[in-house]
Amino acid sequence: MLDIRLFREQPELVREGFAKVGRDPGLVDQVIGLDLKRREAITEVERLKAERNAGSKDVARTKDKAERDVKIAAMKLVGDQITELDAQANAIDLELHNLLLDLPNLPLPEVPVGKDEHDNVVVRVEGTIQEPDFAVKPHWELGEALGILDFERGVRMSGTRFFVMKGLGVRLQRALISWMIDMHVDQHGYTELAVPYLVKADAMVGTGNLPKFADTIFHIEDTDLWLIPTAEVPVTNLHREEILDKAQLPLRYVAHTPCFRNEQMSAGRDVRGIKRLYQFDKVEMVKMVEPATSYDELFSLISNAEDVCKGLKIPYRLLQLCTADLGIATVKYDLEMWAPGMNEWLEVSSCGLFGDYQARRANIRYRPEAGAKPEFVHTLNGSGLALPRVIIAILENYQNADGSVTVPEVLRPYMGGIERIG
């Protein structure tokens, strides 16, 4: 949620930002109009309350009963006006609040302006794409042949976009999760969390998933519970409605969770394999920091995610996302791993800085110094990394001519020393 003062003091800045992300700049005028009506109503209520207070004192001083009754009746009318105006102010406040919840964040000046994902900018490519002397297979062929991916049974029990992982495939995923979390905790200084997979609507509002993305989230019927689309939601809401001490910052958390997304997928797009699913696992990094340090913390976050890519020795690239692909971030970078069997780059991490946009919605603040007025923290999050796309990259980059898959060296201690699948 944006600070209302931006609309009052820098409306042109907000209009420009909305235009860049494809939202109607006219929304700024709606906000300003509602804010003005609300403030006028509040001012009038305060004036009437002062009038009522003065009138009440006057009534107390009036000894003539008839005159006192007239003044009491007049004060009752004032009270009725106050009640009516209070209701109007509350209705306007709710309308304004709901409008602000639906508005996007503002992109930083350095974010490239674009119309869609094709306008994202490749910052750099790391690693060398290998060209083996045999026909590279896609992961779905490898996985089925190795007996570690079962698509038929997954679809039979749950429908399209579901699969069953078996045997060493599961062990590979567990190894990845443990290795990634150990890296983030031991090397990068994160605190590991185990969080609920179901959260209330308020938590979804806090991270910006509601109301805008309601149709992409699974809701438990007849309850106020929603399945999390990412650990970002429960982890960010850990400090909802709290005032932190400056000494507690920065807070760096990491969590592994399943993620559930009711994405509307185009028929025929990415039908095969495990690239696009309604349920998948992910390791997520979340930070809550002082505003002055948030930009530096973003590149530290990206570096933390890159360390996973480097450890696996899989070619990857870093992209800066354009204004059309930011979501609710103010600046965002993606990491994509090369998948030779699919002949494409796969997003495995999206690292974003949100400024105080989420903190304002979730009311997460900190006190810069003892006795000082609380201020909103800045939040950041990024995948560290997303599964099962990392598994796709491992299967397709580490496959051998005989159909087996070499286990990346860093994962072998987590797999009991197993060096090869198949």
Curated annotation (Swiss-Prot):
Its EC number is 6.1.1.11. GO terms for biological process: selenocysteine biosynthetic process; seryl-tRNA aminoacylation. It is an enzyme of class 6 (ligase). Pathway: Aminoacyl-tRNA biosynthesis; selenocysteinyl-tRNA(Sec) biosynthesis; L-seryl-tRNA(Sec) from L-serine and tRNA(Sec): step 1/1. It is found in: Cytoplasm. GO terms for cellular component: cytoplasm. Keywords: Aminoacyl-tRNA synthetase, ATP-binding, Cytoplasm, Ligase, Nucleotide-binding, Protein biosynthesis. Transmembrane segments: none annotated. The keyword rRNA-binding does not apply. Consists of two distinct domains, a catalytic core and a N-terminal extension that is involved in tRNA binding. HAMAP family: Ser_tRNA_synth_type1. This is Serine--tRNA ligase. It comes from Herpetosiphon aurantiacus (strain ATCC 23779 / DSM 785 / 114-95). The gene is serS.
